[in-house]
């Protein structure tokens, strides 16, 4: 829904509820740190905020998405060259498990 809203007139605000960190779906950090920056290069002006985590299988998460119209066009981008590695970053999180499990994952 993000791309059609970016091509539409005006500004849009969307609230999505459900799983934010679930199997077979992009987790919130991927959307925030990879997907949206790629779309930004194409002229899509969108911001996403995590309001509440939603873990599998319970869900209960919530994100808000704000999208500004870009005038109805997308800029082409070329993604054939990776370029220099600028940063490697990771996050370890657990739900309903002892915190030492996340710490152990982070230390690996």
Put a short name on every predicted segment.
Residues 7, 41-44, 51-108:
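Phosphate/diphosphate-binding glycine-rich loops and adjacent basic-rich segments that engage nucleotide
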